[in-house]
């Protein structure tokens, strides 16, 4: 019986039957014929000797016909001699019994093959295609009987109507099954040791490949306190650079100065300077472009709704599309408040909460950049509108940034008509409420730095010196 492992691979059996020489069983080999060793199981054609061989006395009433025909008579009709150059020559013996020739009244091989045969498997398409069809047309029919251990003679004595060469092919099947089961058992043992084994199909290509072997990590970091191990030397070399902080690839753009460990990181960074965005979102109606594949991957989660980063804090259960968002969210659970308002000193756990506080209580601050810059750029940490009373004709509005702008100041000169007055933070001498200041109007002043632009709402008067004088009078009255 064909094993379950070979049920989906019948081409192996066909290849074995067509290309393998099967030794004859005991009782079929002549003791005096030393040159006859095996029969080639190549596809049999209509002109071959096997197609014209029939067992004698093939009548419905014969019972022991197999015993009446000696095996020597069968083998004498087909004798294979091996020549000196290794070629097989087929020589017919002089004593050829005429009863082995097929008569017109003899039943066909297709009629001899019955579904109730006791054989384990029968190549039904052998007879359907003239015993010479290709491997892809072979069909293996499995019997309901499970007894496949009967030898050649017992199977032939049970049903002698099936030709003897089909019985030999059945023995070839049983031999192949036993050999394949042994190989599968061997592969199972070696597969447990981590080896990659697979059983190839008839065309020589692997059909099902096993799991990839897990390579041994032999490279271990020698830095104290680091237990990282690596498989590839390139990864190990990159890891050692992180310990030495060896950033040998520096951005050549003016005013940038960023450095990287590997050249590929620098190439990706240069896209931010030249505006190259090779990764595009192909969702309908979107079409956004990004500089890195990681940014595109994070953007696609907006369309799919995927949020793979889950907060593991007890009772929270929030999930995020990006790991950076999860990292910022974890600050809420830790109780840390690293973001401080530079005007009043109030601290916040999120930078967005601090920015909302500044826009609401200290100044009207907005961002007029693009949407992507608005999501990634940090707004101003704090600002102050200063006034120099000693120099009334040289007023200066200064905005100090301590976030992504690197602490540089944004200065606006030639603003003689602009006074540094805020909603709540006034200069020491201007303690009078803004509602009592005459002829005061709102103006928006735009300040730019790099890729960001800011609009600051300030108060102006028709005569700035008059506003300062009123502030002095108010101070004297108090």
UniProtKB/Swiss-Prot annotation:
Q: Where is this region: Disordered?
A: 84-113, 187-214
Q: Which UniProt keywords apply?
A: Activator, Chromosome, DNA-binding, Glycoprotein, Metal-binding, Nucleus, Repeat, Transcription, Transcription regulation, Ubl conjugation, Zinc, Zinc-finger
Gene deletion effect: Mice are viable and healthy, but display reduced expression of Chd4, leading to rerepression of fetal hemoglobin genes Hbg1 and Hbg2.
Q: Name one Pfam family in it.
A: zf-C2H2
Q: How is it modified after translation?
A: O-glycosylated. O-GlcNAcylation may occur in response to increasing glucose levels and affect transcription factor activity.
Question: Which terms in the Gene Ontology molecular function aspect does this entry carry?
Answer: DNA-binding transcription factor activity; RNA polymerase II cis-regulatory region sequence-specific DNA binding; zinc ion binding
- The residues the record assigns to binding Zn(2+) 3 are 281, 286, 299, 303
Q: Which residues bind Zn(2+) 1?
A: 221, 226, 239, 243
Q: Which GO terms describe its biological process?
A: negative regulation of gene expression; positive regulation of transcription by RNA polymerase II
The UniProt record gives the binding positions of Zn(2+) 4 as 311, 316, 329, 333
GO cellular component terms, semicolon-separated: chromosome; nucleus
The zinc fingers classed as C2H2-type run over 219-243, 249-273, 279-303, 309-333, 339-362
The principal localisation class reads nucleus
What does the UniProt entry say about where the protein is found? Nucleus; Chromosome
Instruction: Write out the residues that bind Zn(2+) 2.
Output: 251, 256, 269, 273
- For whether the record's keyword set contains Glycoprotein, the answer is yes
The record's listing under InterPro entries reads:
Zinc_finger_trans_reg (IPR051061), Znf_C2H2_sf (IPR036236), Znf_C2H2_type (IPR013087)
Question: Residues that bind Zn(2+) 5, according to the entry?
Answer: 341, 344, 357, 361
Query: Any idea what job this protein has?
Result: Transcription factor that binds to the sequence motif 5'-CATCCCATAATA-3', and is specifically required to silence expression of fetal hemoglobin in adult erythroid cells. Prevents expression of fetal hemoglobin genes HBG1 and HBG2 through CHD4: acts as a direct transcriptional activator of CHD4, a central component of the NuRD complex that represses transcription of fetal hemoglobin genes HBG1 and HBG2 in erythroid cells. May also activate transcription of matrix-remodeling genes such as MMP1 during fibroblast senescence.
Domain notes from UniProt? The five zinc finger domains are necessary and sufficient to bind to DNA.
Name recorded for this polypeptide:
Zinc finger protein 410
From what organism does this protein derive? Mus musculus (Mouse)
């Amino acid at each position: 019986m064909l094993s379950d492992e070979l049920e989906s691979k019948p081409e192996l059996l066909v290849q074995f039957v067509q290309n393998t020489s099967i030794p004859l069983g005991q009782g079929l080999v002549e003791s005096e014929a030393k040159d006859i060793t095996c029969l080639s199981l190549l596809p049999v054609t209509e002109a071959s000797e096997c197609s014209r061989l029939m067992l004698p006395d093939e009548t419905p009433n014969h019972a022991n016909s197999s015993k009446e025909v000696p095996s020597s008579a069968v083998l004498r009709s087909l004798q294979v001699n091996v020549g000196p150059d290794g070629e097989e020559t087929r020589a017919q013996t002089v004593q050829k019994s005429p009863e082995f020739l097929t008569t017109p009244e003899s039943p066909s091989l297709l009629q001899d093959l019955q579904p109730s045969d006791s054989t384990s498997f029968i190549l039904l398409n052998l007879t359907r295609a003239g015993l010479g069809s290709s491997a892809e047309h072979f069909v293996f029919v499995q019997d309901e009987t499970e007894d496949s251990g009967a030898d050649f003679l017992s199977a032939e004595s049970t049903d002698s109507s099936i030709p003897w060469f089909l019985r030999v092919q059945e023995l070839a099947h049983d031999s192949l099954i036993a050999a394949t089961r042994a190989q599968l058992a061997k592969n199972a043992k070696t597969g447990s040791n981590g080896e990659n084994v697979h059983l190839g199909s008839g065309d020589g290509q692997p059909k099902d490949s096993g799991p990839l072997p897990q390579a041994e990590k032999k490279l271990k970091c020698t830095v104290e306190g680091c237990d990282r191990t690596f498989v590839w030397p390139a990864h190990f070399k990159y890891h050692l650079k992180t310990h030495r902080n060896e950033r040998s690839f520096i951005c050549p753009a003016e005013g940038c100065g960023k450095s990287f460990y590997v050249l590929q990181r620098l190439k990706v960074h240069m896209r931010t300077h030249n505006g190259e965005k090779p990764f595009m979102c192909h969702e309908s109606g979107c079409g956004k472009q990004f500089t890195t594949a990681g940014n595109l991957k994070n953007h696609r989660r907006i369309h799919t709704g995927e949020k793979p980063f889950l907060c593991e804090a007890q009772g929270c259960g929030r999930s995020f599309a990006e790991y950076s968002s999860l990292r910022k969210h974890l600050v809420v659970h830790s109780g840390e408040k690293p973001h401080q308002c530079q005007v009043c000193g109030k601290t916040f756990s999120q930078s967005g909460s601090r920015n909302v506080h500044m826009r609401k209580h200290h100044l009207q601050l907005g961002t007029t950049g693009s949407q992507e810059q608005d999501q990634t750029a940090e707004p101003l940490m704090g600002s102050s509108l200063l006034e120099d009373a000693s120099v009334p004709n040289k007023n200066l509005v200064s905005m100090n940034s301590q976030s992504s702008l690197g602490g540089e100041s944004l200065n606006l000169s030639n603003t003689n008509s602009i006074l540094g007055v805020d909603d709540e933070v006034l200069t020491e001498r201007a303690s009078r409420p803004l509602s009592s200041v005459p002829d005061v109007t709102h103006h928006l002043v735009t300040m730019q730095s790099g890729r960001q632009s800011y609009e600051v709402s300030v108060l102006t008067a028709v005569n700035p010196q008059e506003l300062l004088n009123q502030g002095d009078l108010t101070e004297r009255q108090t």
